[in-house]
Every structure is written in structure tokens, then in C-alpha cells.
Regions:
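Membrane helical hairpin/interfacial module
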Residues: 53-120
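Beta-strand-rich domains and repeat architectures in extracellular enzymes and scaffolds
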Residues: 41, 51-52
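Juxtamembrane helix-loop boundaries in multi-pass membrane proteins
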Residues: 3-45, 80-110, 126-129, 145-155
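Residue-level signal for alpha-helical transmembrane segments in multi-pass membrane proteins
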Residues: 44, 73-76, 139-142
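A generic, well-ordered mixed alpha/beta core segment in the N-terminal half of proteins
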Residues: 110-144
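Physicochemical signature of membrane-embedded alpha-helices that form the seven-helix bundle of GPCRs
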Residues: 59-65, 124-131, 155
Length: 155
């Protein structure tokens, strides 16, 4: 005789706690987190060039997951905290961190070419890197230039 639990024996999971925790974590997400993709990719490429395929491939897959998660979190940040996201973009301290998304995209593209031979994914990431580079360079540096209140050089 099998014992089957009744539905009232289980508490319903409160998804609002999970959603609020995600929102709180995304709110102040640093744009410089793509530096993790850069660094992981560089180590993965070095391992590949040194003939360590297990390390190289493991870091390559870790990098793909990290890259996708970071883009997902940044899209959520744009949706939920639009003004804070764009305020960070023109902030003298946090703005330059956005450039790590360019380098991270291009390093991951290099991994796709060297480790998996996937030129299509690499080309997509290269084009994305160019678009991000043009967009971020002109947005961030224009904002820095025309901003009335600029920090001093020692800040």
C-alpha cells in the first residue's frame, strides 16, 4: 500500500520571496562583472594553447554559462531599474565597467573559434562587440564630456 501525501501537507512556495531577492541582487549589479568572462576566457585560451583540453573545455563551458547569466541579469536590470542602469552608464566610477562587456564578448568569441571551431558564434559575438564598442564609447565619453559636475582627477 503506497502512502501518498495530501496536497495540504505541503506549503505553497512563495515565489515573491525569490523574485524580491532577485530584484534586490540585480538592483546594484556592477557592469564590470563581465571581467569574469574576460579572465575565465583568457585562462581557458591559455590552457588550450598549453595542451590542457580538460581545463580549457571546462572553463569554456563555464564561460558560456556565466556570459548568458550576466546578460540575463543585465536585461532584468534594464527592465526593473532602467534609470539606475543608465545612471551607472554615465557615472565616472561605474561607467567604465560597461566596457568589460565588449572585451568579454570578444574573448568568448575567440574561445568559440579556438576551442570549438564555431565561427558563426564567434562572428555574432564579434559583431556584438563592435556594436557595443561604438554605442558605449560614444554614450559614456559624450556623457563624461558634457556633464556639468565632474569629479576632480584625484577622485
Amino acid at each position: 500500500m503506497a502512502i501518498s501525501p495530501k496536497s495540504e501537507d505541503y506549503q505553497k512556495f512563495d515565489y515573491s520571496l525569490l523574485l524580491n531577492g532577485l530584484k534586490e541582487g540585480v538592483k546594484d549589479l556592477s557592469p564590470a562583472y563581465f571581467a569574469m568572462v574576460m579572465a575565465t576566457g583568457i585562462i581557458s585560451i591559455a590552457a588550450h594553447l598549453l595542451g590542457m583540453p580538460l581545463v580549457s573545455i571546462t572553463l569554456f563551458w563555464l564561460n558560456i554559462v556565466t556570459y548568458l547569466v550576466l546578460w540575463f541579469l543585465n536585461v532584468l536590470r534594464v527592465v526593473w531599474f532602467t534609470s539606475q542602469f543608465f545612471s551607472d552608464m554615465v557615472d565616472h566610477k561605474r561607467g567604465p565597467g560597461f566596457f568589460t562587456s565588449i572585451a568579454g564578448s570578444c574573448v568568448l568569441g575567440s574561445q568559440f573559434v579556438l576551442i570549438s571551431g564555431n565561427f558563426l558564434a564567434a562572428t555574432f559575438l564579434w559583431i556584438l562587440g563592435i556594436i557595443l564598442w561604438i554605442g558605449l564609447t560614444y554614450t559614456i565619453f559624450t556623457a563624461f564630456t558634457i556633464k556639468e559636475n565632474k569629479p576632480s582627477l584625484d577622485e
